[in-house]
Amino acid sequence: MFAVAPRPAPLAPAQAGPSTSPQQTLKKSSSQSSITSAPTKRRRTVTPEDSPQDSAPSQPQKKAREGPKKKKANRACFHCQKAHLTCDDSRPCQRCIKRGIANNCREGHRKKAKYLLDDDELEALKRSKEGAKGKAPEPQPQPQLHQPVVATMPISEPVPQSEQLLTTAFDPTTFAFGSEAANLEYSILSAILGNPSPPDSASSPPPPPSQSHYSWPSDPLDFTASPRLGTSFTSSYTDAQQLSISSDSVLSTSPSAQFLNYSYSQQQRSDEGSDLPYSQYSAQAPLHPLQPRYPLDQRPRSPPTSTVGEKVSTDVASRGLLTPPLSNASPSSIASVPPGVAEIPQPKSAVSHLQSINDRVTKPYDYTEGYHFLMKHLPTRFEKNDILRVVRALAIFRPSLIALQMPLSLDDEIFVEKCFQRSLLELGKLISYSGTPTVVWRRTGEICLVAPEFCMLTEWPMEELVGRRKYIYELFENQSVVEYWENFASHAFENTTRSVYSHCVLLKPDGTPVPATFCFSIRRDLFDLPSMVIGQWLPLL
């Protein structure tokens, strides 16, 4: 009988490709087995036993503190607290001992918060604050200014630099305006612009030996009205707050102010208060800066007087000025004239004109008659289209005119008419200096003032233009009338332009056209109503 050997294990299927030798297969298998059999390397952990004791440490170890830890002090001393340094509880502390200031080592003061204070401490804090407020600092002596002194005036003591401007030049009682605020403003301006030299000391009484005297007229005209202007204006040089100038020793400071401010007559001024002592003036209580110098119902009503001469009055009357011109006479010669000699009243031409305006204007001006005449005049000259253009222009500014006139009372309208008449006086004087053909009319077109040059240009007589009720659009050609009303409607309540320039054709009495360039400006009254129109023409040659 035969024994059967076991079947060998099946080989892996051969890969496609070239056949390999048995030696190569053995090498590959041996290399793979060696890779799988080798264990993976692990990082060795160093234990305290394995580490060498004598090796240097990688990092330096912290040095152990010698002695007990320093305890923080509950409260630092004053010097350590001020220097923001660490202190200890011992007194004197070690730091002060090292610095050699052990004798001054004291407890520092720590400020408590308000919510931590006790009631007693709160009361003490309030009392200390009230006491600090109650103690007012003593007033320091003010720096003193100085103005050069006239050589003819004796000086008994030197005056510091800033004294005179504070006590005399800036004295609000020097000038006789309605309020001391205006007096102070004018006195400062007078000091800045420079003051004229005072009059000769021979015309004034000798001053006391203990006081210096100064005269401060801001205008030469002051000497003509004040016989006491050359007398003493005393001021104390020990107290800049004391006012020593007589309250009624100066008249108005400018020529134009004579008609605006009340003033004493010479007889009144020479009789009252001329010999009052210095103490009586300095003892008067100072007024409030806005308080008037005199009550309105007690102000003297005498008109200003002039002692210059008859020539001044005739000059003013011939020119129709509201204010008299400055005199050529020197202040000293005028001040030496005694009161009552050559005393001639002011010209009454300007005053009479103003008084006549106040007496004549008793009711407001009726503007409705001017518009009624315009509505009657348009159909007689214009076609329908031109009439519509004029009416449309009137409709533009009519609502604004009514809205501004509604709140006005009867007194307001009378006041507006008085202002209008006064403006005509000023414009009449201005037109007399100009050679340009000029006409002034109301907003309705009624002519109020005509320059002679306009009469020469248009050959219209002055009596017919001003004496009768003549309207400016009656002198215009038709197209110029329409353009005028359209321009007036556009600029009656406009603030961007003050004057309107255009062309205009004027008509002579016989109907001959006069082409010219035309410029007119609209003036408004106190209530912003267009009340006056000023027109000027230049002929086109």
UniProtKB/Swiss-Prot annotation:
Pfam families: PAS_13 (PF24990). Residues 196-210 have a biased composition (Pro residues). Gene3D superfamilies: Zn(2)-C6 fungal-type DNA-binding domain. It comes from the Eukaryota. GO terms for biological process: cellular response to starvation; gluconeogenesis. SMART domains: GAL4 (SM00066). Residues 48-61 have a biased composition (Polar residues). Residues 1-75, 126-146, 196-221, 286-315 are annotated as: Disordered. The keyword DNA-binding applies. Residues 77-105 bind DNA. Belongs to the ERT1/acuK family. Transcription factor which regulates nonfermentable carbon utilization. Activator of gluconeogenetic genes. This is Transcription activator of gluconeogenesis ERT1. It comes from Coprinopsis cinerea (strain Okayama-7 / 130 / ATCC MYA-4618 / FGSC 9003). The gene is ERT1.
